[in-house]
């Protein structure tokens, strides 16, 4: 809410809720950095709903810096869950998308996917036209403009009644700040992170946070042995959804750093998740990014076996957050113009989402 503070969008999902003393919000606040992370995405978020969220803030993304966590776990065979998408989707996102769409491959794919995941969406006739590559009539455009204005007014009205919520700050950030040294030093922070993690991962063999293990895994861990043996992330509509996000970043000339997190390697071994398949997925994601000019990538996908790198089965914590900070802080603290992105609409196709060959041979 501070107008003078530079807020930087950090796009992701449930990793932002994995608080410990090395969490990006804690470090930014404790060491009074020149920016504050603005976390976007909750549990169950993925690229498709991030894309629609971006429609509401396209002017704020223009020429700015962003951080984007892209989790290989999103890339399941069936893709994004319709109920999760509908839970986060709202009418303001819809009118923002409809009023800003350019009738291009991105607009068409977004409309097709929207009808798949939300068949009863408002203004479905307009969405249907876009999905077929047709132009909207001037009547439809006026109607969308009117609805967008109404949504903005409603938003402004209700935001007057929203209490300034400092609960997250008081409960999740302040308590951790007290444990950190006043002078910033990665060496000192690593010692604190390791000591804290050691204490909090004592009740299981996976190096998972005690509380998470007790509440989420302890009662069913025996049943989960080998359950991911056949899991694959190589074929998924999520690759096409990711392309929407890349297209938006290119249009907004946003300079982005992408974070690829690992899986807890002990958990990976226990559940039978193939490390080779995971790396093939990462290679496919990286090719989609790098071949279009998105070359700022912090790839932690092979670090799931490092001590106290992971807080649970798939989320970073402690030393993982410090590795994240070493990559992200210099990038965000020293903003640079976006590179000249070369968007390739072939990444919207089913051929790409189902492709399992060498990524660089995809034509």
Show which residues each predicted segment covers.
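Short extracytoplasmic
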Residues: 1-16
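Loop/turn elements at helix/coil->beta-strand transitions in domains of secreted/extracellular proteins
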Residues: 5-7, 35-36, 62-65, 251-256, ...
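Membrane-embedded segments
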Residues: 16-107
């Amino acid at each position: 809410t501070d107008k003078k503070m530079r807020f930087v969008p950090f796009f992701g999902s449930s990793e932002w809720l994995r608080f410990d003393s090395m969490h990006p919000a804690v470090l930014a606040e404790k060491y009074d950095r020149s920016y504050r992370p603005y976390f976007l995405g909750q549990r169950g978020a993925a690229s498709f709903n991030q894309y629609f969220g971006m429609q509401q803030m396209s002017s704020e993304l223009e020429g700015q810096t962003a951080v984007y966590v892209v989790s290989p776990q999103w890339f399941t065979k069936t893709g994004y869950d319709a109920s999760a998408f509908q839970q986060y989707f709202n009418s303001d996102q819809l009118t923002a998308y409809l009023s800003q769409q350019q009738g291009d491959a991105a607009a068409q794919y977004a409309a097709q996917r929207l009808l798949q995941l939300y068949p009863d969406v408002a203004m479905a006739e307009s969405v249907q036209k876009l999905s077929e590559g047709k132009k909207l009539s001037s009547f439809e455009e006026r109607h969308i403009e009117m609805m967008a204005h109404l949504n903005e007014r409603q938003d402004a009205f209700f935001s007057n009644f929203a209490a300034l919520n400092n609960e997250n700050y008081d409960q999740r950030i302040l308590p951790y700040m007290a444990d950190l040294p006043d002078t910033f030093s990665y060496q000192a922070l690593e010692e604190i992170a390791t000591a804290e993690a050691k204490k909090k991962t004592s009740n299981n063999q996976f190096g998972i946070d005690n509380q998470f293990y007790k509440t989420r895994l302890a009662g069913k861990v025996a049943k989960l042995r080998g359950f991911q043996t056949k899991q694959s992330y190589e074929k998924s509509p999520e690759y096409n959804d990711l392309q929407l996000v890349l297209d938006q970043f290119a249009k907004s000339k946003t300079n982005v750093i992408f974070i690829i997190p690992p899986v807890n390697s002990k958990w990976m071994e226990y559940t039978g998740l193939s490390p080779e398949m995971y790396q093939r997925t990462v290679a496919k994601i990286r090719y989609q990014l790098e071949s279009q000019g998105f070359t700022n990538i912090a790839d932690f996908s092979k670090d799931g076996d490092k001590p106290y790198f992971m807080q649970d089965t798939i989320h970073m914590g402690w030393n993982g957050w410090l590795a994240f900070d070493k990559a992200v802080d210099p990038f965000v603290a020293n903003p640079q113009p976006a590179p000249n992105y070369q968007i390739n609409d072939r990444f919207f196709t089913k051929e790409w989402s189902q492709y399992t060959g060498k990524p660089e041979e995809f034509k």
